[in-house]
From Swiss-Prot:
Annotated source species: Yersinia enterocolitica serotype O:8 / biotype 1B (strain NCTC 13174 / 8081)
Documented EC number(s): 2.1.1.182
Catalytic activity: adenosine(1518)/adenosine(1519) in 16S rRNA + 4 S-adenosyl-L-methionine = N(6)-dimethyladenosine(1518)/N(6)-dimethyladenosine(1519) in 16S rRNA + 4 S-adenosyl-L-homocysteine + 4 H(+)
Main location (coarse class): cytoplasm
Gene that encodes the chain: rsmA
PANTHER family assigned: DIMETHYLADENOSINE TRANSFERASE, DIMETHYLADENOSINE TRANSFERASE-RELATED
SMART domains xref list: rADc
Any one Gene Ontology molecular-function term assigned to this protein's record: 16S rRNA (adenine(1518)-N(6)/adenine(1519)-N(6))-dimethyltransferase activity
Protein name per Swiss-Prot or TrEMBL: Ribosomal RNA small subunit methyltransferase A
Amino acid sequence: MNNRVHQGHFARKRFGQNFLNDQFVIDSIVSAIHPVPGEAVVEIGPGLGALTEPVAARMDHMTVIELDRDLADRLASHPQLKDKLTIHQEDAMKINFSELAELAGQPLRVFGNLPYNISTPLMFHLFSYTSAIRDMHFMLQKEVVNRLVAGPNSKAYGRLTVMAQYYCNVIPVLEVPPTAFTPAPKVDSAVVRLIPHVNTPNPVGDVRMLSRITTQAFNQRRKTVRNSLGDLFTPEQLIELGIDPILRAENISVAQYCKLANWLSAQSTPQE
């Protein structure tokens, strides 16, 4: 038996397809999402509809984004789903989620069992639309969820952590074993809830500066910030900002990174 075939569909490696088939896990995710009729619900990567069917059963309408043409066609002809779905057969990385929210007239509730090979870049894409998103629920590789929820002074803490927690309140929901999927992935999975901040705890004037600093620091995470950020800050400036220059990237909190970004933005802004 070919374990890459599920419900007559051959799972494509290039799309990172692993299909959820554990009913307890499915029910737990739908309960966590708690969709309500009238909300603007968007699913990324519906696949064979394991989550789509129970969510759509509670809704009058929902939007799905599916890159695989065969799967999009299956959904379009699904007897229970076809009249409830707006299907975008395209790459979620190219979707303007602000436009979807504008069409819906309200912020989006986004969910999905994300292909693990694109989950991190897709998260960064979604972060740029948090003003148009009410909440997000995603199945991800457990290691990625650990990075999203990590605190300073841990190996899991990195650029993804800082940027995710800058934009959202990040809450782990559920751990999922490989046996819940066909074909079974080689890693454990987990579900996470991300709720964009209504009032950002650590406002940053220029998010590009925060992205630049965190990229530079974590690309050289073994170095002290005195060295990794040496072209941006002198040791004296770091001390003035409350940061010991001998710390490494993983020792600096989200609030401190935001403080660094705001300070650097102020230095870059021409004084009147």
